[in-house]
């Protein structure tokens, strides 16, 4: 069960110097919980980062704030230190976003929003959550004062960071950090959090290729070589494309419309097993595919008979190139499309 030990909310207005800390009424707690759940469990598009320097502004504030709460017995009675430190984190984000807005004003605008911070305790482990969330702004008709509001539905989290923490002897140490950014804005991780990616695109591509390939060998290959090689080929084709990969979408594309030739293959069970890996830390759930990784693993060698082996590279539609037939005599043959004249002439004889 998740317990929120401390939480804060600051409105960020790029036109003023400091963030505005807001008291959180009890009926707003459901919003805070939803933002935390999205950042910690519901969001499946994130990357894992590590802390190269524990003395940067945000990481130092997180450690000191969390240590103070732990020293108070996980119940915040004296809010002085937590409020000062959460104010510092909010000021850092506002300053960074003001700089980015000035630099990028001719191209785009920084997404408007507020910053939610929370220290949570769940299953005996501490985590600190920072989320940049959507808010709307309007001016009071009488006072012309600027007001902020939050949508009743479709609560959007623009960016988030979930910092694993360990507490020992009154000190708090950072672990891995799960970072989400809906726009790919570099400033969130690089300038605000000041963290570095734990996995490169090459490592992510290798790990996804290995994990999915291992599950296909375990659950599909033993039942149907035809289905195994079709799915393996589709996986290679997707990862060989120079594009952004969303792991959940990748698995969906593999299985949504695919109908196994062998009815004993439970494709939904395979899909669930593969999606369960998204909660681990062996790869990021969103990364840029590295085609060079797949190129090294894209050739498959088939034994045709004692004298012929067939080597097939990754191809989008292998059935258009190679067909398998059984003659009435019982003989099994492969029909291979050939566009190389020399190879064709080496075997062709006019009747």
What are these model-derived regions, one by one?
Residues 253-351:
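C-terminal structured domains
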């Amino acid at each position: 069960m998740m317990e929120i030990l401390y939480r804060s909310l600051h409105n960020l207005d790029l036109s003023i110097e400091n963030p505005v800390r807001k008291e959180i009424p009890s009926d707003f707690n459901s919003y805070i919980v939803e933002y935390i759940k999205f950042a910690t469990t519901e969001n499946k598009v994130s990357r894992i980062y590590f802390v190269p320097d524990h003395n940067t502004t945000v990481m130092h504030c997180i450690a000191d704030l969390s240590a103070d709460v732990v020293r108070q017995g996980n119940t915040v009675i004296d809010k002085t230190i937590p409020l000062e430190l959460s104010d510092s984190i909010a000021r850092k984000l506002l300053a960074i976003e003001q700089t980015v807005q000035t630099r990028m004003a001719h191209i785009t605008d920084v997404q408007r929003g507020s910053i939610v911070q929370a220290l949570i305790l769940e299953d005996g482990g501490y985590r600190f959550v920072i989320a940049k969330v959507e808010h709307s702004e309007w001016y009071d008709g009488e006072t012309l004062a600027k007001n902020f509001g939050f949508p009743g539905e479709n609560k959007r989290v623009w960016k988030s960071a979930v910092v694993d923490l360990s507490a020992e002897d009154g000190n708090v140490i950072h672990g891995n950090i799960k970072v989400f950014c809906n726009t790919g804005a570099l400033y969130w991780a690089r300038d605000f959090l000041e963290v570095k990616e734990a996995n490169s695109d090459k490592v992510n591509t290798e790990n996804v290729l290995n994990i999915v390939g291992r599950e296909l060998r375990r659950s599909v290959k033993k039942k149907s070589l035809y289905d195994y090689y079709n799915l393996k080929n589709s996986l290679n084709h997707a990862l060989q494309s120079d594009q952004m990969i969303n792991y959940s979408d990748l698995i969906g594309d593999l299985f949504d419309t695919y109908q196994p030739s062998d009815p004993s293959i439970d494709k939904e069970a395979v899909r669930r097993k593969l999606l369960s890996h998204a909660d681990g830390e062996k790869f990021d759930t969103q990364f840029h595919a590295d085609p060079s990784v797949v190129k090294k693993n894209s050739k498959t060698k088939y034994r045709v008979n004692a004298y012929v082996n067939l080597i097939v590279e990754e191809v989008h539609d292998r059935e258009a190139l190679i067909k398998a037939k059984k003659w009435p005599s019982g003989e099994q043959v492969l029909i291979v499309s050939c566009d190389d004249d020399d190879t064709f002439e080496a075997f062709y004889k006019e009747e």
